[in-house]
Design a protein with these regions (language model features):
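N-terminal hydrophobic/helix-forming segments and targeting peptides
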Residues: 1-464
């Protein structure tokens, strides 16, 4: 039976983003395989320092050398630069002159967490604790009553340092923040959800045993804990002032659901974009345009500091790279193009009120192209031009990448920002593209494997 004129016209003029499994079922197995590599990366890389260490090993194993602005480079050469052990840049030299611009892919590798305070240790009621200061936008109540692991670095008086990683191995102890039992939480229950657990209540259990022969001293449990730390690492209490220690969920990335189509883990924001970005970088053997993959720090607190995109370290790198070819950095930036590789909120059917269904990203419909982020009247957004949207969409369509558009929730429901605005400050065209995430900024976020895989395909196409 022939299609009605209305149906034929609707098919020609209307469009809905399809479920990938319905139109490209062959991608299910490919996505699962790609996700296995990502799971391994996620489990090894719980902090920005650990990501840099893991990525540096990957780059060196694939022939990358440390960038030297005094050297000359030719097409196909692979170089990288580490910024203070907390951010990394990687490039493959393209066949086109650098004056034609470079292709940039920028993700961030910091995630919401609990940081140790400079003077963190105390004892109360014969229990030793650490005081923490939360990093990034978290729901504080989500961090209580769950296993935590400790990661970081402590410098000692003699200038040496020790790296910490406690709570990830099965035989390790974990750390813990308490909450009230419901039988005694009548007063606490009247708090707002935001204040259910307060920042000053994010205190981590360390120990409860006193130091031997300690009847005549104060804080004997704290002393016992300090003795253990001194025996393990050779540190004293004063050394915490020259430390960077982070507490993160002591969990592993796991498949979700009977069909294993989803993946839960800590740090999807934004390592779910950082991983496919660096894989696409490594696989770019002979790109037309020189590539620049950015894995930056500090995005969760505004891209501040000298390892965040608000600093000049990326611009300086582009300038030095331009000088290697006798080019003007301003000319290079003006002709360059960038994907700000960051996640967006996936539509959550349990909480539909904060989304506008026609302009939301959905699981299993591909990477999400976000024209603008920000809050209220697009405040804090870059807002990509129609010309650049067309350029990026054309690349993805040409390479059969599944993509969708989406905003960060309904108007005035909240908002957020990415590194796009700081890339735009360098006079570079930029748009956000990444993976939709359920329960973003929680200790255990969820993504779709098919969306992850198509984000990788988008990055690969962008570099090719």
């Amino acid at each position: 039976m022939a299609e009605s004129k209305a149906k034929a016209l609707q098919k020609e003029l209307s469009y809905e983003y399809p479920h990938i499994a319905k139109v490209s079922p062959d991608q299910i197995e490919k996505a699962a395989e790609f996700a296995n590599g990502y799971k391994n990366f996620l489990n090894k890389s719980k902090t920005e320092r650990e990501v840099v260490k893991e990525v540096t090993s990957l780059l060196e194993a694939n022939g990358y050398t440390v960038f030297d602005p005094k050297k000359s480079y030719k097409p196909g050469d692979k170089i990288y630069k580490v910024n203070r052990k907390k951010a990394v840049l990687a490039s493959t030299i393209g066949t086109e002159p650098i004056t034609e611009g470079i292709r940039i892919n920028g993700a961030h590798i910091d995630s919401p967490r609990l940081d140790l305070r400079p003077n963190p240790m105390y004892e109360k009621s014969e229990t030793a604790y650490f005081k923490t200061h939360y990093y990034g936008g978290i729901k504080k109540y989500q961090w209580a009553t769950m296993p935590l692991s400790m990661h970081g670095v402590i410098f000692k008086k003699d200038g040496s340092f020790v790296e910490l990683n406690v709570g990830e191995n099965e035989e390790d102890p974990v750390f813990y923040i308490s909450d009230l039992l419901p039988h005694l939480s009548k007063k606490q229950d009247k708090r707002t959800l935001e204040e259910g657990i307060k920042g000053e209540e994010l205190n981590i259990f360390l120990g409860t045993l006193p130091f031997d022969d300690s009847d005549d001293i104060k804080d004997s449990v704290k002393l016992k804990t300090l003795e253990i730390l001194n025996q393990m690492y050779g540190i004293t209490e004063r050394d915490f002032a020259r430390a960077e220690i982070e507490f993160v969920p002591a969990t592993k990335a796991r498949d979700v659901g009977f069909d294993r189509s989803l993946l839960a883990g800590y740090g999807h924001d934004d390592r779910v974009c950082a991983y496919p970005a660096i894989i696409a970088e490594v696989e770019a053997k002979s790109p037309k345009y020189t590539t620049l993959t950015i894995l930056a720090d500090k995005e969760e607190i505004g891209s501040v500091g000298n390892t965040g995109l608000h600093s000049h370290f990326v611009y300086d790198y582009i300038e030095y790279l331009s000088q290697c070819f006798g080019a003007d950095v301003k000319e290079v930036c003006e002709k360059s193009a960038c994907l700000s590789s960051d996640v967006n909120a996936a539509f959550d059917p349990t909480f539909p009120d904060v989304y506008e269904p026609n302009n939301s990203a959905y699981l299993n419909k591909g990477c999400v192209l976000t024209k603008y982020t920000g809050a209220r009247g697009k405040s804090g957004s870059s807002d990509a031009s129609a010309e650049f949207m067309n350029k990026v969409i054309s690349i993805m369509d040409e390479h059969n990448v599944h993509w969708q558009t989406g905003e960060l929730g309904a108007i005035d429901a909240g908002g957020g920002g990415t590194i796009a605005q700081y890339v735009a400050m360098m006079n570079i065209d930029v748009v956000d593209l990444g993976v939709p995430v359920i329960s973003m900024h929680s200790p255990y976020e969820v993504i779709s494997k098919l969306d992850l895989y198509n984000t990788y395909l988008a990055f690969k196409a962008f570099y090719e």
